[in-house]
Amino acid sequence: MKNHLLFWGVLAVFIKAVHVKAQEDERIVLVDNKCKCARITSRIIRSSEDPNEDIVERNIRIIVPLNNRENISDPTSPLRTRFVYHLSDLCKKCDPTEVELDNQIVTATQSNICDEDSATETCYTYDRNKCYTAVVPLVYGGETKMVETALTPDACYPD
């Protein structure tokens, strides 16, 4: 009897896991900003009030990196206590895209708030694709030298 109950319990957990995974797969990733530790997904669901109507559901996940420094490249800088997230800045896509319009190919961006000055954004964690360095003291043979070291070696030293 115990084996029978255990089998049905394991089967129920497996079916629930498959159902949750299927729901995650139908989400569309709108933003995955590793620099700001933010991810925004979207999916279309049926309205519980009107079955003929669909609703767009947004899921905004922000991971606040505690114990991070104001300047992530400087381990002596003070701890960051203020995190600012602007949804419009997270969602803007300023990369130019080629679009065909009236049999002509036009270069356009998907956002109308692109500005060259706003290109430098504050990162709350390391962007693994960007090279970060810091100057650290190195003691070798009784001599102390200040050397530059890579904080993200994979991005700083190509294969």
Swiss-Prot record:
It holds the Pfam family Ig_J_chain. GO terms for cellular component: blood microparticle; dimeric IgA immunoglobulin complex; extracellular exosome; extracellular region; extracellular space; monomeric IgA immunoglobulin complex; pentameric IgM immunoglobulin complex; secretory dimeric IgA immunoglobulin complex. Keywords: Disulfide bond, Glycoprotein, Pyrrolidone carboxylic acid, Secreted, Signal. Its main location: secreted. Residues 1-22 form the signal peptide. GO terms for molecular function: antigen binding; IgA binding; immunoglobulin receptor binding; protein homodimerization activity; protein-macromolecule adaptor activity. Transmembrane segments: none annotated. Glycans are attached at residue 71. Part of the secretory IgA (sIgA) complex that consists of two, four or five IgA monomers, and two additional non-Ig polypeptides, namely the JCHAIN and the secretory component (the proteolytic product of PIGR). Part of the secretory IgM (sIgM) complex that consists of five IgM monomers, and two additional non-Ig polypeptides, namely the JCHAIN and the secretory component (the proteolytic product of PIGR). JCHAIN-containing IgM interacts (via CH4 domain) with FCRM (via Ig-like domain). Serves to link two monomer units of either IgM or IgA. In the case of IgM, the J chain-joined dimer is a nucleating unit for the IgM pentamer, and in the case of IgA it induces dimers and/or larger polymers. It also helps to bind these immunoglobulins to secretory component. This is Immunoglobulin J chain. It comes from Homo sapiens (Human).
